Every structure is written in structure tokens, then in C-alpha cells.
Amino acid sequence: MTTRGTKSALRPPTSIETTDAFAADVDAGLTAKPKRLPPKYFYDAAGSALFEQITRLPEYYPTRCELALLHENAAAMASFFPSGCALIEFGSGSSRKARVLLGAAATVEAYVPIDISSDFLQQDAAQLRRDFPHLAVYPVIADFTAAPELPPAVAHMSRVGFFPGSTIGNFEPHEAAGFLRRAGRLLGAGAVLLVGVDLIKAPDSLYRAYNDAAGVTAKFNLNLLARINRELGADFDLAAFEHHAFYNAERRRIEMHLASTKRQKVRVCGVTVEFRAGETIHTENSYKYSIDSFQALAHGSGWSPLAVWSDNMFGVHLLRVTNET
């Protein structure tokens, strides 16, 4: 029997553990050639709030298209969910999309949002408990790209995975395959997984989505440097860096960079990092797939495609795990 009601999140890493990992990743990324930073660090409280603004921008079609597909097809998607299951969301953010599924799937008894942003996750979990009083909500503060520990309360429940937002595209293809294999092990034999995937399309639509007129995406990108200043005591001059986003047609991905506007030196984690004028920090990729190419990736990663709901912009894939990988 599932225990209902409020539950605290699994113990998050201590602030020292979190800061040490952040510092190590920043040091490794800024001393690499070319320079890079992991996109998971976008999502502190300020970054998470900025991303929520991005999802409501007129240029940013992925959220709008995915929500429409979910609203139109939630009942069909939920028909694949086993009775008494737990819905596990990877990188939950505001859980806006999970709410669509929760409203359509009476078979879901527990919801486990996994997210790296502690404050944002706890606030959203509290609101979910108010909105769905008969649903057990177990937030897990963790990096979902690693191997998060699920709450003991869902250990014996069937599990449905949910990975919306085209976040799968932020991984290199081999990393996406690795994530899918780990998700299969976490969710267990016979589990199903819903994945949102951005489709290949005209470059101008892609460009506008990542270069909005209001400049919110630029603020989101630059907030990564602001976070490094706040948490690691660096001295980045945000006015000396610019947001650059473009479509790399050969690799079928959007690339986001922060470009230095001048020759400069920045002190980070006790190390002096030099930048040439025009040199960039590569902060994110967003790979685009055809329906067939994503299903081939899934099939090679231990999943069998069951269904796909799509328009000409976006696709939501339903997969079933085929083997323990």
C-alpha cells in the first residue's frame, strides 16, 4: 500500500558537496580547449525562473507545441500507464507538463519529480500537494543525469518515466543513449517512458527560438556567469560577454555560447582564465531529431518504440524498456 500525503525530499547533497562539484566542473570547463560549461548549472533559482519565462515566449515553440500534444493526447498516453504506478519525471522544473498527465491518469498513485534546483523543486512540490491532495509527492533533489536514488515508498510500484521539454537534445547522441540505458535500469523491467523530442525544421524557426526579441534567453545564458560569481567568488564582467546562439546544420543542433567581447582575464576558483576577443564558452547544445532517427536511438539503447504523437514541430515518444541495460 502506498503511503499518501506529504513527504520530505530525499537528502540533497550538502552545500559543501554541491559547491565542490560545481567548482570542479567550472575549473575543468574553463581550462579546456575550447572552453565549455555544463548546461545543468543553468538551473539555480534565478536560472530556473528565467527558463520558465523562456517557455512562455512567443518565439519559443517547443513548450507550446509539447503542451498542445499533451493536452490533445493525454488520455491516450495515460492508457499505457499500469494501475497504481509512480510517475518519475527527470528534470521536472515547474511540473507544468506533468500536471496534464496527472489530470488524465487516475492510475498514477505517486509522483517523483527529480531536479537539481532545490528551492524551485520544494516550492513546486508543495503546490502539487495542494492541487492533488490524494497524490503522494516525493521530490528528489538530485542530478537526474547521474543515478538518482528513488524514494523507498515507490520501490514496489510500477514506474512510468517522463522526460519532456526536448531536454534529451541537450545530450550528445552517445550521452542520450547512456541516459536512456540508465533510465531503463532505474525504471525497471516493463516500464514505459514518455520523451519530448524537438524535430528537425527550418533554421530560421530554430534561430528565433533561441534569440528572442526580449532577450530573456540571453539573460538565461549570462546568468551562468553570474552564478559563478555569486557562488564561487569569480569576477566575470557580464557586460563583457554576449549571448550567441546559432544552428549548426551539419550536426543538426542549436549551439549556445557566451562570447568575450574583448581580450580579458577572469579570476575563477583561484585560477586566472584568459579570453581572446571573440573567444567563446560553449554552454549548451540542443540536438534535433527526425522521428525515425530518435526511434533508432531509443531502440539501440534498450527501448522499444510504442507510439509517437507529433506535429511538424515536435514529437512525444512513448517507449517500453526491452531489457535491463
Regions found by a protein language model. Name each.
Residues 114-119:
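Conserved SAM/SAH-binding beta-strand->alpha-helix loop
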Residues 34-81:
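Class I SAM-dependent methyltransferase Rossmann-like catalytic core
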